[in-house]
Amino acid sequence: MWALDFLLSFLLIQLAAQVDSSGTWCYDSQDPKCGPAHWKELAPACGGPTQSPINIDLRLVQRDYTLKPFIFQGYDSAPQDPWVLENDGHTVLLRVNSCQQNCPAIRGAGLPSPEYRLLQLHFHWGSPGHQGSEHSLDEKHGSMEMHMVHMNTKYQSMEDARSQPDGFAILAVLLVEEDRDNTNFSAIVSGLKNLSSPGVAVNLTSTFALASLLPSALRLLRYYRYSGSLTTPGCEPAVLWTVFENTVPIGHAQVVQFQAVLQTGPPGLHPRPLTSNFRPQQPLGGRRISASPEASVRSSVSTLPCLHLALVGLGVGLRLWQGP
């Protein structure tokens, strides 16, 4: 069993290095010539009908009572194995998949069996003074967005996972800026200063319980689910997205530190701060957005007009019954 776990961990390390790692694309803030409008030229799936991110319109969501609570493994304790923080030129990634036992994973919550193993988490943010989340709830964005990327353990290769609609499960958390720092992000933010240029990776000086980055236990019951894609090329439609209703705070000074991370600029120019590393929202099309039993939904039709019509109909019916 130990040998099998070791082999799986090794494979996941290799697979994680391939997720969101292409260097042939960019964001508009880096160079509009290779920005999101051109991604479908590099990866045809980026122009497909089931792309991410999207706006979660609470008038369109449908309650789904099969969306039970998540079962988290390895999220409540700080692992002994070191974590790697990396600047890949497009975002900051925290690779957390070099574990030997009790590896972070999720199951339940309507996800297919057996489980989804955590590969990495990364962040999206805006330019100074602007919102930077990829998803939104009723058009409300966050200053940043955190993605926890998990891969279905029944697939043995990245190619297999990328080609299946249940290949990945990504947890999306909107981060809302506040004046006071959130100490749960301190270990990550303190490592940002060491990411002096794209391609640099450093070991974090300390690990922590991943659960500390998520909403509280009760708030984890409130989430939305839809089928979508990776939000960077190749944009494969292989993701079961979970967008939590409740946000997590992050300090203004901490957001500024992310906005100071260096990116790769156009040839001949010095690296400059990476900002606005988010993909524009994509059409929902005919997809369903499901709400967990505890999540908020909002009716698109007021009950008052319906009540008025019912009363009018009742009056007409009584007059017809009574005769002229």
UniProtKB/Swiss-Prot annotation:
Repressed by coumarins. Pfam families: Carb_anhydrase. Keywords: Glycoprotein, Lyase, Metal-binding, Secreted, Signal, Zinc. It is found in: Secreted. The keyword ATP-binding does not apply. Reversible hydration of carbon dioxide. PANTHER family: CARBONIC ANHYDRASE (PTHR18952), CARBONIC ANHYDRASE 15 (PTHR18952:SF134). Substrate binds at T231, T232. SUPFAM superfamilies: Carbonic anhydrase. Its cofactor is Zn(2+). This is Carbonic anhydrase 15. Belongs to the alpha-carbonic anhydrase family. Residues 23-293 form the Alpha-carbonic anhydrase domain. Residues 269-290 are annotated as: Disordered. It comes from the Eukaryota. Glycans are attached at N184, N194, N203. One of its GO terms (molecular function) is zinc ion binding.
